Each structure stands twice: as C-alpha cells, then as structure tokens.
C-alpha cells in the first residue's frame, strides 16, 4: 500500500511539472500571437537569442550567456509592462524564470536585477566597483578552479596510475 502512495505522489508531481510547462508554452504562444511573430518579416531575419546560445557549448560558458539572455528577457518584460492585455502571460513566464533560473528564489532574482540596473556611468559607482575588483576577481577565479577540480572524474583521466584500464589498479 505504501508503494502505491509513493507512485501516486510521483505521478502527481510529474503531472504538475508537465502542466506548468504547458502553461508557460501556452503563454508564450499568446505573446507570439499578440506580436504577430509568425509574420514573414520576422522569419527573414537571423534569430536574436537562439543563434547566440548555439555558439556557447561549454557548460561553464553556457551559464554566462544564459544569465545575459535572462537579463535581456527581464528587460524586455519590463519594457512591456504597459501592455495590459499580455501582463498575465508575462507574469507566468517571469514566474517560470524564477523557478528555473533562480532556483525559485525571488531574492536571487532581485539581486540579479539590481546588478543589471546599477548605473555604470556614475563616478561613485565606478570608484566603488574598481575598489572591489580585486576581491571579485579572486572569488571568480577560485570558483573556476574549484569547478575544474570538481569536474575530474574517475573515467576521464586524472591522477590514476593505469589510465588504459579504469577497472584495474596497479
């Protein structure tokens, strides 16, 4: 009986996840219809975001470009806030971004937006940013080194004595 409940709960979770995904897709379709994005003049041009994303293959690199893409869409949604007829769609998509990109943390999203709206032409901001730069660079470089160390696997080489026969040891 206990396993049946677990299976039912698992199915419920999957159905909720799929339902949420379809809801976002429906809202995106509403935006496409609102902007008439299937028009021939839209298809004649190169993609704005998809082509760029295809160029970034490395996992570490993908996170960098994904953050820029999310920033782009958040700015786009902010610019569209006056369009009342599509606000529900925008809010649904924004909520999905919070769940998927910001690990369901509104605070992380607020920090992200705060960082993207800092006025870089302000002299005081420039002075503070330059003052913090050494610490920021140190933290970023140590994060990259940590990721490189963590990405080593027992199947990918590393410090094993016998790399040709992973199951054997000398």
UniProtKB/Swiss-Prot annotation:
Homodimer. Interacts with IFNGR1 (via extracellular domain); this interaction promotes IFNGR1 dimerization. It comes from the Eukaryota. One of its GO terms (biological process) is humoral immune response. Type II interferon produced by immune cells such as T-cells and NK cells that plays crucial roles in antimicrobial, antiviral, and antitumor responses by activating effector immune cells and enhancing antigen presentation. Primarily signals through the JAK-STAT pathway after interaction with its receptor IFNGR1 to affect gene regulation. Upon IFNG binding, IFNGR1 intracellular domain opens out to allow association of downstream signaling components JAK2, JAK1 and STAT1, leading to STAT1 activation, nuclear translocation and transcription of IFNG-regulated genes. Released primarily from activated T lymphocytes. It comes from Sigmodon hispidus (Hispid cotton rat). The keyword Nucleotidyltransferase does not apply. Keywords: Antiviral defense, Cytokine, Glycoprotein, Growth regulation, Secreted, Signal. GO terms for cellular component: extracellular space. Glycans are attached at residues 36, 103. The gene is IFNG. Residues 1-20 form the signal peptide. This is Interferon gamma. GO terms for molecular function: cytokine activity; type II interferon receptor binding. PANTHER family: INTERFERON GAMMA. Belongs to the type II (or gamma) interferon family. It holds the Pfam family IFN-gamma. Its main location: secreted. It is found in: Secreted.
